[in-house]
Swiss-Prot record:
Stretches annotated zinc finger (B box-type): 130-176, 186-227
Localisation per UniProt entry: Cytoplasm; Nucleus
InterPro entries cross-referenced by the UniProt entry: Bbox_C, Filamin/ABP280_repeat-like, Filamin/ABP280_rpt, Ig-like_fold, Ig_E-set, TRIM45/56/19-like, Znf-RING_euk, Znf_B-box
Domain of life: Eukaryota
Main location: cytoplasm
GO cellular component terms listed in the entry, alphabetical order: cytoplasm; nucleoplasm
Function (record text): E3 ubiquitin-protein ligase that plays a role in the regulation of inflammatory response. Mechanistically, mediates the 'Lys-48'-linked polyubiquitination of TAB2, a regulatory protein of the kinase TAK1, leading to its degradation via the proteasomal pathway and inhibition of the TLR-mediated inflammatory immune response. May act as a transcriptional repressor in mitogen-activated protein kinase signaling pathway.
Entry GO MF terms: ubiquitin protein ligase activity; zinc ion binding
Protein name per its UniProtKB record: E3 ubiquitin-protein ligase TRIM45
Residue ranges covered by zinc fingers (RING-type): 29-98
Stretches assigned to coiled coil: 281-335
Length: 580
């Protein structure tokens, strides 16, 4: 149903009480609740401060890796490809959605930097008269101006020093209050390998942004182009994934609405049936009151079972919807607000997340129905010596209670029909006593998983279903039996298919000489021969087994399966005994 969530032992940093995901838009950390500081983008597309992530309790699982880099998180722009043997993989849990995050080799600081969040923080700070912004040079004083040439925020002292230097004398300086109308004021994104160079190009071969020094160095022979020239192709691929993800949000919302309606219907039916039960039980005084209490308890059990099932499905769909919304909202924000370079930097994480979300399977229909009814005329046995009437009927099949029956359930022969019985039961373990349930059977060869065997399911109309299939080849097969898309007891199970039973084409004789009437050219599979040019076996002669056997394969048991494989091992004269 939903994305894999890994339980974590020990303390894990969680959201503070009353905190919701995505608090304060895109500028505040969901953990510390303050403006983002060095925000890192997780594979689930949630953003958290670097220091907050470092404070989370990590866990480790054994991970086998070859010569590939970590793919769970993009990390920084550059990652070395180093072969790694069996080693523990360090991970954390996302403090927003509890998704497992496998950390790259560089740890938290190797996760992708969320440049969109940094830009939003800058804009948020400007709206608050620059409060919270510190000088990019001295990191000590509050910002007063911004150098539009260097794209750096400067305090008054550094601004004066900036103007006194010959190289920066003529740089354009702007007051912070004059930048409030800007939508993009982020810092230039510099190359990790060459900090003096800005990332302006994109390597198609390595699928990552590069600088000018990278192009003439490590990526000299690689196809590279400016980010503005390649953004259309890569942006279109992300938009295509987004178009495939958006319909899931509507489908999940509709499914949750159906669950809510079904839950209300269940509650209404419970109330109605309870009223019927109370009305019917008034005439029988103590006996009926006792019977009534039993019926109400049974009804409550049914309600709890149905409600728990609906609540579980609701929780799973809500979590999946939250994940889908996060993916859609972040991607839409990225495509509408992000720069070309920001889209390219974040593209890998977004594509991986949306691809994973698009592969998640879920049911858009409630897992249970509101079918609960009361039959007042149905006999319910004796209660305190009185014959009472009235029973609750749900008769909803419970896959966990359904069983498989058959003598040769795990054995079959090639090209011969095999069969077994599926007995459907309800939640109380009683036979359904009727047909109409959706029984699905799949028979798959273990060595040819893409070639399932054709199966037939016959409804006997009494709660049992006759399943038959004919395996074409010997080997091991896996049989999956599902009711309401859930496995029944004993499913899946394996079936060993042996070769088809082969009858003997020869004769069961004491020796070739006797069975052939003394023919010299008659042979026997036992390998015995006789002097005088006889090709077959004879009593007391060389190679004779000393007991009756089959002429075709040499087996001693008269009632057995022939093992003669044909071809060179069985000349034509070997079977002449049959004709004679």
């Amino acid at each position: 149903m939903a994305e894999k969530r890994r339980p974590l032992l020990g303390f894990v940093g969680k959201l503070p009480s009353g905190t919701t995901a995505g608090n304060s838009g895109k500028t505040h950390c969901p953990l510390c609740m303050g403006l983002f500081k060095a925000p890192r983008l997780l594979p689930c597309l949630h953003t958290v401060c670097t220091t907050c992530l470092e404070q989370l309790e990590p866990f480790s699982v054994v991970d086998i890796r070859g010569g590939e880099s970590d793919t769970s998180s993009e990390g920084s722009v550059f990652q070395e490809l180093k072969p790694r043997a069996l080693q523990p993989q360090i991970g954390i849990l996302c403090p927003v959605c509890d998704a497992q995050v496998d950390l790259p080799m560089g740890g938290v600081k190797a996760l992708t930097i969320d440049h969109l969040a940094m830009n939003d923080v800058m804009l948020e700070s400007l709206r608050g008269e620059g409060q919270g912004l510190v000088c990019d040079l001295c990191s000590d004083r509050e910002v007063e101006k911004r150098c539009q040439t260097c794209k750096a925020n400067l305090c008054r002292f550094c601004c004066q020093a900036h103007r006194r230097q010959k190289k920066t004398t003529y740089h354009t300086m702007v007051d912070l209050k004059d930048l409030k109308g800007y939508s993009q004021i982020g810092k230039p994104i510099l190359c990790p390998a060459h900090p003096a160079e800005e990332l302006r190009l994109f390597c198609e071969l390595c699928d990552r942004p590069v600088c000018r020094d990278c192009v003439v160095g490590e990526h000299r022979e690689h196809p590279c182009d400016f980010t503005s020239n390649v953004i259309h192709k890569h942006g279109d691929s992300v938009r295509e994934l987004l178009r495939g993800t958006q319909p899931h949000v509507e489908a999940l919302e509709e499914a949750l609405a159906q669950i809510k309606g079904t839950n209300s219907a269940v509650q209404e039916r419970v109330k109605a049936v309870a009223a019927d039960i109370r009305t019917f039980s008034e005439g029988y005084i103590k006996a009926i009151e006792e019977h009534r209490d039993k019926l109400l308890k049974q009804l409550e059990d049914i309600r709890v079972q149905k409600e728990n099932s609906l609540q579980l499905q609701k929780a799973q769909l809500e979590q999946l919807l939250a994940d889908m919304r996060t993916g859609v909202e972040f991607t839409e924000h990225l495509l509408t607000s992000g720069s070309d370079l920001e889209i390219l930097i974040t593209k890998g994480v977004v594509v991986e997340r949306l691809t994973k979300l698009n592969k998640v399977e879920y049911s858009a229909h409630p897992g249970v129905n509101e079918k609960i009814s009361f039959s007042p005329k149905q006999k319910a046995g004796l209660c305190r010596g009185y014959e009472v009437y009235g029973a609750i009927n749900t008769k909803e099949v419970d896959p966990a209670k359904c069983v498989l029956q058959g003598e040769d359930l795990h054995r079959a022969r090639e090209k011969q029909p095999a069969s077994f019985i599926v007995l459907c039961k309800d939640a109380t373990g009683e036979s359904m006593g009727r047909g109409g349930d959706n029984v699905q059977v799949t028979v798959i060869p273990n060595d040819k998983k893409d070639s399932p065997v054709k199966t037939m399911v016959h409804d006997n109309k009494d709660g049992t279903y006759y399943v038959s299939y004919t395996p074409k080849e010997p080997g091991t097969y896996t049989v999956l039996v599902c009711v309401k898309e859930q496995h029944v007891q004993g499913s899946p199970f394996t079936v060993t298919v042996r070769k088809r039973h082969r009858s003997h084409p020869g004769v069961f004789h004491c020796c070739t000489f006797c069975s052939s009437g003394g023919q010299k050219t008659a042979r026997c599979a036992c390998g015995g021969t006789m002097p005088g040019g006889y090709l077959g076996c004879g009593h007391g002669h060389k190679g004779h087994p000393g007991r009756p056997h089959w002429s075709c394969c040499g087996k001693f048991a008269e009632k057995s399966e022939c093992t003669w494989a044909g071809g060179q091992s069985a000349p034509r004269s070997l079977l002449r005994t049959v004709a004679l």
